[in-house]
């Protein structure tokens, strides 16, 4: 909708990044952009985007201890169901494979809206590749501002992992306190 930008205070996405997770030829595209790169390209061209990409979400990976703390803070029963399931997923997806942490990608995007200090952003020009066979869906970030194009995106660079864990645990404690 052409009037949408004037109604938005801030447009934050979990997608893109300085590396990807889907293409076989070097993992240049991130799934949320790759699934519809033409639409993503329009978004980046029409809106000022705050991009929480894979590079930033991976910098906020949580440990097994963090997940155990989250379960304890949520309490028993249905309140802890989602956290327990997320912990099971982390066990299979990461911990059983020898990794010592796991990422809750979308939660970092939400946390960056709640508390902007959780993520360091830099403003750069970002182009979405939507025609290249090999790099289709890649977010090309002009980190050195060589293109001469006006920066159109706040790119999440690195998370404050401790602050992110604190925000997540505070949320779990809140839900754990509900009757």
For the regions a language model picked out, list residue spans one by one:
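Active-site histidine-anchored catalytic micro-motif
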Residues: 1-59, 64
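Conformational coupling and interaction surfaces
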Residues: 34, 52-179
